[in-house]
Amino acid sequence: MTSSQDKTLPFQETLRWSKITSLRTGKGEVLVCRPKTSDDLAALLQAQGAGQIPPLCPLGAGTNMLGYDDNQPLAMVRLAADGQFAAVEQLGNGLFRIGAAALLGRTLEKLASDGYGGCAGLSGIPGTVGGALAMNAGANGQEIAEAVRSLEGLDLATGQPWAWQVGQGGWGYRQSPVPRQVLLTSAVLEFQAVSPQEEEGRIRQEWQRRQRITPRGASAGSVFRNPPENSAGRLLEQTGCKGLQSGVYCVSQQHANWIVNETYGEGQAEDCLILLREMQRRVQESCGILLQPEWRRPC
């Protein structure tokens, strides 16, 4: 696939999957669109409806996504970090409307400096607010779902608005009510009034903790969800998964639930899948538990 086959929009380009995933995986190409405004999104939907670009698919920062080794007939939509979808608006009473393209860690830092917090435990999670919401990201016993009051987005398959309000449910461990084809555009989150100095200190401590425990190399974070009342990392370590390698990827010696690319170069998605399947096989054969991936594949 080349961009010459598609309607040319000023905010689109053709990239290799390895350029849009934090794991740097996937040698195939895909169309990537970075709309800044609602008008840009409308232009994308119009082009899709006319068959001038491939089907649209949401893309956050690519921090928990596995790419493809072949070209895919998709147009990945990554909201621009310098457009209207990264704005933060104070609504009063601790409520803020936050654009889905805003980076989660930076947003929490800015809110802390303004005297709002309560989510410091999530501040070390990489990626965008939209991506964190789509998977209900969590850390330190917290989940982002706890702060959500409403969501707004766009169903890329139908072109229709999509919305969620508190009380409608749909949240769970690494699970949200957001359908796979919905591109989140904003969310209303509720924060507590806090001491800026104390909240900034908590965020600083979380960043320091992350730096200590995060394995070296390009990665997409934890490979598998924790099974009920158990730890995926512990099961993987018990079954000898540390050090397994395929291509440029290996299971980290520091944390058995991480696959890392210590070369930081481009790798094949198939090598990641080889490791993922072997990790699953070992745990299932030894412990009778089929680990469920935390990573996603587009659409």
Describe each region flagged by the PLM.
Residues 2-129:
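Anion-binding (especially nucleotide phosphate/pyrophosphate-binding) glycine-rich loop
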Residues 11-13, 19, 65, 154-274, ...:
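Phosphate/pyrophosphate- and phosphate-bearing ligand-binding catalytic cores of soluble enzymes
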Residues 26-27, 31-38, 66-85, 134-167, ...:
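Structural signature of FAD isoalloxazine-binding scaffolds in flavoprotein oxidoreductases
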Residues 27, 61-63, 102, 125-132, ...:
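Gly/Ser/Thr-rich helix-start
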Residues 52, 59-61, 147, 217-218, ...:
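Short, basic and Ser/Thr-rich N-terminal targeting/leader segments
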Residues 61, 105, 135-138, 167-171:
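Short acidic (Asp/Glu) patches
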Residues 102-109, 137-138, 176-179:
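N-terminal short leaders/motifs
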